[in-house]
């Protein structure tokens, strides 16, 4: 009898181990807290399922759930805390793309990011930071951030109506260590000299924050809620904050 009990226990242990191995093999890796932009461009996408997927160097990670082909939840990953991207203050030409589906929200923290894309008048480049989709994107400012476009067709932080009518909110709700400040100043920023900064500069036809040129010129639904933000347009009449050359800035229903 004891032998049978031992055999049953052994089988249960083996079955549990096999199940855990299956979960490990099927599960998608949970995303890291912080991404180093020096290692490659980063794409952050919140899809209609409400899960956020982060891709860097063809490696995609998620904050959501791993599922099998029957859509059963296999493993619950970390709570959503948003994504932090940094270059440690070092200049890079790698870019950030944030895309948010309708009725969803993506939270991204810029921590000492310094992006300068290569100079181009042939519209062959890309925006340093591109905001896409019909959902809500929040950019939290930590440390000192510099975003400069080198392409005459693109804004530094580009949010073109062609790519969606969602919202972009730039804010400074948290301390630089992502803790909640005890006090805020009259502008709503973290008090005590912990204000995040942003310098966004367009090039040519692009805005500092907003539209690029041509079919990317129109923009909408941009809010600066906090932080110390300096935005300058390109030399061909791009706005500091607003549309690119000949573009319009407006509040668009989404």
Where are these regions (language model features)?
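A composition-driven surface/loop motif
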Residues: 16, 27-254
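Bacterial Sec-dependent N-terminal signal peptides
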Residues: 1-19
């Amino acid at each position: 009898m004891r032998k049978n009990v031992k055999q049953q226990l052994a089988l249960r242990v083996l079955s549990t181990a096999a199940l855990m191995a299956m979960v490990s093999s099927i599960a998608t890796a949970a995303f890291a807290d912080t991404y180093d932009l020096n290692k490659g461009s980063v794409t952050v996408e919140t899809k209609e399922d409400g899960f956020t997927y982060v891709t860097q160097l063809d490696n995609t990670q998620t904050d959501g759930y791993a599922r099998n082909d029957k859509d059963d939840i296999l493993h619950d990953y970390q709570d959503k805390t948003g994504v932090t991207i940094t270059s440690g203050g070092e200049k890079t030409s790698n870019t950030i793309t944030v895309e948010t589906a309708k009725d969803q929200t993506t939270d991204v923290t810029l921590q000492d990011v310094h992006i300068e894309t290569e100079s181009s008048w042939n519209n062959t480049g890309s925006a340093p930071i591109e905001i896409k989709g019909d959902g809500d994107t929040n950019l939290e400012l930590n440390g000192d951030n510099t975003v400069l476009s080198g392409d005459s067709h693109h804004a530094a932080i580009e949010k073109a109506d062609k790519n969606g009518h969602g919202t972009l909110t730039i804010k400074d709700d948290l301390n630089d260590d992502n803790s909640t400040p005890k006090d805020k100043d009259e502008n709503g920023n973290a008090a005590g000299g912990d204000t995040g900064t942003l310098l966004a500069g367009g090039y040519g036809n692009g805005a500092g924050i907003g539209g690029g040129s041509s079919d990317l010129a129109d923009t909408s639904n941009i809010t600066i809620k906090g932080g110390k933000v300096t935005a300058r347009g390109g030399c061909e009449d791009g706005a500091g904050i607003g549309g690119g050359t000949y573009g319009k800035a407006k509040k668009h229903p989404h």
